[in-house]
Amino acid sequence: MSTQVLPTRAKIVVIGGGVGGTSVAYHLAKFGEKDVVLLDRSDLTSGSTFHSAGLVGQLRADPTLTKMNMYSVELYRELEKSETPASWRECGSIKIASSNERMAEIRRQIGWAKTFGLDLVEISNDQIKDLFPLINLDGVVGGCYMASDGQVDPSSLTGALAAGARRGGVKIFTHTRVLAINTKDNRIASVTTDKGEIQCEIVINCGGMFAAEIGRLVDVRIPIIPMSHQYLITENFIPDEVKFLPSLRDPDNLIYFRQEVKGLVMGGYERNSKPFTASANSFDQIPADFNSKLLPDEWDRFEEIAENAAKRVPVMGEVGLKNFINGPEGFTPDNEFCLGETSVGGFYVAAGFCAHGIAGAGGIGKVVAEWVIAGEPTMDLWHMDIKRFSDAYKSPKFTLERVKENYEAYYDIHYPGEERSSARGENKSPIYDWHKENGAVFGEKAAWERVNYYLKATEKDLDQSLQPNGWVGKHWSAAVALEHHATRNSAGLFDESSFAKIKVGGARAGEFLNLICANNVVKGVDKTTYTQVLNKKGGIVSDYTITQVADSEFLIITGTAFLNHDKGWLEKQMRENNFDQVEISDITKELACFGIWGPNARKILQKVTDFDLSNQAFGFMNSKMIKIKDISLRATRITYVGELGWELYIPVKDGLSVWLALLDAGRDLGIRPCGYRAIESLRLEKGYRAWAGEI
């Protein structure tokens, strides 16, 4: 039953009464937050939750997500003993390999599972048949089994979480539509509903497939696309004497199964995916009355899945069909959750569960509640942080292209160094065309085209003898070794124009940066400092270099993918610490950035400038304005590869001229254009760490 009288004030308002919203509310109450209101536009579970398939698998490629899913299982066991059980069934799960490559992946996953204490074991075909007697083993190479995986009824789970939240003091209002979210000084101030206004400090957007619409109320782009996801339920046919079946996944055939009463649920991830939208001009807008509804059946898109299912479980071609479900699920561009505080202070999101929100719901609720209470993540959630998305994802069309590709690759084997092919070419270096004409093999990061390495026409027959076998060697190239050795022995020239560049200025800029940075960064004009940025517990939020370019102006250089994360953290600290005389701006696209490193770097650079580059005149971690071909640019003596060299920051319009001048000057000194794969190899060889990887 919904609480009747809407309060005029609450500390926290949760929008969305699906499994995500109720889990967040449950955990807020569990951690002592009593002043919480949850709102839903219709009934609880009326978005995507009610039609979710209910599978709960724990092991994922991401360690953080694995830990979150493991917590979910612990929570569901606990809820099953409560006054309102969650209908949790610990039936186990099987994954089978229908190819040798998949079997190799399964064996890798068994190794990963051991690091978490998970009971994932390899099983033979006979054991698979014993556990799942309905299976046809044709083409099956082997499989694995995890006894502690299971399934849960999504509506019962949501009900159990909502009941627990209410017992903890949370007030829940259904059939209450949010009309506006109001801000003051870029912070949450109140929520306006069709039943009145609630003054509040924090809003948590748990709107699921509606999350993008809710985000637009505060002009925040949330890159979630509702995708049609289909599955069927058979009539009852499993004899009573058959033990309850574990769930079964056959990713090579794109299908999954679980038992439903005495029948089967069967679904999958088709190669011809389709978004759900209110109109042809919008990719993330849901009809206003789409509550507790499904989409029309699209059997033609499901046909391949059904055929694969009948081959793997032949009875699927014989039994009757009880129900066919086509329900929209919110997907993100990388199939990871979308969590955390946005660019608006106090406006959080917990959505985009990519059809595995039931498995993750317990963990999602826990980490988001902790994040809200602490004001920062309590564990490494970078891969789920909404700030991981670049500004390119403000385009629904760009987002859709990437969502479709990742949806259709959901069950694929993923290899180190693989690249996405969709939504390419959004951001390019000013010398992109030169790279392309000279054999560059491009990768993409945060919607930037970047050179991975070069394959020159004269080097097609590279030495492949060192290529690793199997999974690791899929995207390996001998060209990286050539670039690596050129940098160590002569000089490498790198285009790092995608690096994020943030200008911090104002009367209190130095004071502000010294507050949030672990190192003193106010060392005088033209001094550069490498520093970590710490949270209240001393954890590393980010790391970057800061160059003082004037008395009250600083240039921050950080990773390509970290612009919104790092700029967002700066803005949050400025807001919370009342530094109103500080200005923060993104100047990434104003400057090209080239790195020239190696034993011959000084000789090459000195040939094109009159400025003294000697060690005495231009020491390490110093920065100066110099000229190359009458072009003024900033040169910073720094290295990310462990060799002598400089990073050069050049007005974009002059980028090609400087690049060509350096190549020409270094022709007789062994200079070689190099890509990001060489940077990775070089930095790791020297023990240089990267945030979000080794840090």
Question: Language model features by range: what are they?
Answer:
Residues M379-D380, I386-I695:
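Glycine/proline-enriched, intrinsically flexible loops and inter-domain linkers
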Residues P154, V261, S279, S292-N427:
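C-terminal catalytic lobe of FAD-dependent flavoproteins
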Residues L6-G20, V37:
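Beta1/beta-strand and adjacent pyrophosphate-binding region of the FAD-binding site
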